From Swiss-Prot:
Cross-referenced SUPFAM superfamilies: Rhabdovirus nucleoprotein-like
Function, as annotated: Encapsidates the genome in a ratio of one protein N per nine ribonucleotides, protecting it from nucleases. If expressed without protein P it binds non-specifically RNA and therefore can bind it's own mRNA. Interaction with protein P abolishes any non-specific RNA binding, and prevents phosphorylation. The soluble N-P complex encapsidates specifically the genomic RNA, with protein N protecting the genome like a pearl necklace. The encapsidated genomic RNA is termed the nucleocapsid (NC) and serves as template for viral transcription and replication.
Family assignment from sequence similarity: Belongs to the lyssavirus nucleocapsid protein family.
Name assigned to this protein: Nucleoprotein
Localization of this protein: Virion; Host cytoplasm
A GO molecular function held by the record: RNA binding
Sequence positions bearing Phosphoserine: 389
GO cellular component: helical viral capsid; host cell cytoplasm; ribonucleoprotein complex; viral nucleocapsid
Keyword list, A-Z: Capsid protein, Helical capsid protein, Host cytoplasm, Phosphoprotein, Ribonucleoprotein, RNA-binding, Superantigen, Viral nucleoprotein, Virion
Assembly and interaction partners: Homomultimerizes to form the nucleocapsid. Binds to viral genomic RNA. In nucleocapsid, binds protein P and thereby positions the polymerase on the template. Protein P acts as a chaperone on free protein N to prevent it from aggregation before encapsidating genomic RNA.
Gene from which this protein is expressed: N
Additional information: Displays a superantigen activity in human and mouse, activating mostly V-beta-8 subtypes of T-cell receptor.
Post-translational modification (record): Phosphorylated by host CK2. Unphosphorylated protein N seems to have a better affinity for leader viral promoter encapsidation. Phosphorylation of protein N in ribonucleocapsid may stabilize the interaction with protein P, thereby playing an important role in viral transcription/replication.
Amino acid sequence: MDADKIVFKVNNQVVSLKPEIIVDQYEYKYPAIKDLKKPSITLGKAPDLNKAYKSVLSGLNAAKLDPDDVCSYLAAAMQFFEGTCPEDWTSYGILIARKGDKITPDSLVEIKRTDVEGNWALTGGMELTRDPTVPEHASLVGLLLSLYRLSKISGQNTGNYKTNIADRIEQIFETAPFIKIVEHHTLMTTHKMCANWSTIPNFRFLAGTYDMFFSRIEHLYSAIRVGTVVTAYEDCSGLVSFTGFIKQINLTAREAILYFFHKNFEEEIRRMFEPGQETAVPHSYFIHFRSLGLSGKSPYSSNAVGHVFNLIHFVGCYMGQVRSLNATVIAGCAPHEMSVLGGYLGEEFFGKGTFERRFFRDEKELQEYETAELTKTDVALADDGTVNSDDEDYFSGETRSPEAVYSRIMMNGGRLKRSHIRRYVSVSSNHQARPNSFAEFLNKTYSSDS
């Protein structure tokens, strides 16, 4: 018997077939550099920086920026941001720099140039006759890179969220060591004219390069990162959520995964922890692999590990975390089942801790405590393990164990308890729910059952 087939009758004729559905047509690609060459892009001819500054600033004021010119200028302006490498810097077998080397952002990557001249038009008129200073270049670079961050902000953020961020960014780039070069609200006005610039590969690449540099190198102009920080772990929300989750519940990755009681986690856990990646290497190219073009479709995104992502945020909702309540549900990854498991895990980790004495007045007190603890352990091992209580919460002698939680779920037939539903409704009903968020899902799914 073929386990994948179903049998039924059509007009008295027996039909046997294998139902096939649309599968994920994308191939997840792991970031890797196999040829020992730094990530690279190709831009037009390197400009005269004074001419380029005046042209790009003019375009910023007129809200008419040329993306090719902006990228060419950003690459050329890297020379203003020299710093000292604090340690030998290697990633994927490539020596980026040695300890003590003087480096700039373009030391991290390879920027190839053609002979094609840029436009360098003065769309906003000629406002600056003298040559710009380094603080003026730094301010322009900071404002341009901030267009990346603004274009990554989702439309679901309500009110004046984006405008407020744009105003705060402008304030950063008009105070020392930077200098005011644009009028108030210029950044937001210009952003509206280039709202999708985060999808331009070269602009994204340069934002990631600047971010990787300033995240490691102490520099006067490190605040430029305010516009590029979103390139760090970009499209890695699944892996980032898991990392935050294990810190939140105070378990190791191995201990946490033991609580993942569902077959759909198997493929995702294998995908997320593929051997050979530099996930744990500080300042690796891995951190910026999406912006540097090292992977087409991230295997670490919320969609790639949707069941894990859903579970983590249902647990977060149970614990009242605003970030989880606002996160977007991955609708195709069993959210109803994940909400059930999330309720049990939320109960297990919420309002409950594992505590022990770790500090003592002197060595004698420490030794007495350790001796007493050993005696307790011996007594526990000698116990025949008989449980006299019918209360499922005392089903296991160990307060935090996968076995105890799994037993509770099985005893309840894989359904949520009333107390879980009340908690879910309580946290979600007091929250202004965004469309397709976990708060909205919990409200719609469980509010009638409370």
